[in-house]
């Protein structure tokens, strides 16, 4: 759930420190988590992929490295840089593979992974038959004088190597040029998809005018311009009445806003990036988008997704349902989620929420921090680092007060319970990870222990072989959910109604099983932790059904003019 996962994806692909230019500082995770631990994970993943590509295509390691480079997209000179890396470092990697060592040994030999004094040895694959020390000594001897060692030992970054300085310069420039010049934070709505653009909140329809944005009440019934970007504007020539007045007045338009974590933002590492049997140039086409979206896919999320899902599931996001119910709601969505977010830092998220109490339509706000209050990067005593019910109570009340001063009257806030993470271990521990499917050698138990050992596990409490720890984590999550339920039952606010909904995972599993699915198919394959796209859409379906049944006012009325809006304005300018 933490942002350094991005480092894991970008840096190993090139083994370059690109992350410093693409990531933004956030998270309040303990400072003990070091980015080189992610480099170790990244190295093991990439080396495994190279090894398996050679195996599947019955090719040399050299050919397999070049094959991987050929699959990478051209953006940011990724492909060129990859070939460069093969040219410089390939010979050493080949020499190591010749000695029949696994990815753990390769990465420890090249010092992308380091066993620190007094710390356990972290490995993904089973340990070699000969002793670890002996194997490593032997491997180290092979690459003693190699350029890659000069790099990893210098700690100064690969760009400090004279023969790579030029290409580094080129990559940095390419990244800089791919980022919109406009400061994406100062103006919250954007005409760009990524970097917190319209994948995250409704697309702006006039980038040069700050009084124009999705979710506002129409200015002068939008007779002359589309001030709220819902695609409805102008005057009906037949009777001189503005369309926005004719079709939307009294229709109770409203937006949807999610205050969430990586699950709400739909964190997802495509399994295609690691599955060699299917790997092709198509596998990495989405890499630049993914990286500039913090490895999140809000455009496909259960709450604010607006693109068609690639999964065969027919369920729609909450946003698309609200839009279908009342087409005046077009583009009124905000996914204010962040990897690593929890009740502890939700207040800073609210600062980036855009809602003007006087000018805008009411909103449905969903607070869904489903894990990070009990998940944290600390291996030593994870329980003491969890949010207590008292702390959660204080954090959430502060957040609600802040919301009360932001939201237009008539809004609704739904507090969502915490996840039931014990499901992860129960469902996955004996299954093979995508990386282990070819040779049946990496299970989720091994992945969890590898990540936990390196202190980069997104949730050591639940992603653990320790049954007692998993139970304690679940117990605390339940106490926190109960606290949220109590707050919703006892507190009143002037500008919104407050509700609580359980994270009813069992119901989602049952629904999925009725559709012929298996429980493990609801979890992200690569990280073995997050709910995947199917799960998120099933959750959205469940939430919608429950709200419609219990509190129908939250969703607003069905707009009888929907067919006319479609007739006059088509897809209303799309998303
Ligand atoms: Ca409009």
Curated annotation (Swiss-Prot):
Coiled coil: none annotated. Residues 172-176 are annotated as: Lipopolysaccharide binding. Ca(2+) 2 binds at residues 185, 187, 204, 206, 209, 212. Its cofactor is Ca(2+). Disulfide bonds join 40-113, 43-107, 69-82, 122-453, 159-168, 205-229, 248-328, 375-459. One of its GO terms (biological process) is negative regulation of inflammatory response. Cleaved into a large and a small subunit. The small subunit is N-glycosylated. Its EC number is 3.1.1.77. Residues 26-34 form a propeptide. It comes from the Eukaryota. GO terms for cellular component: cytoplasmic vesicle; extracellular region. PROSITE patterns: SAP_B. GO terms for molecular function: acyloxyacyl hydrolase activity; calcium ion binding. This is Acyloxyacyl hydrolase.
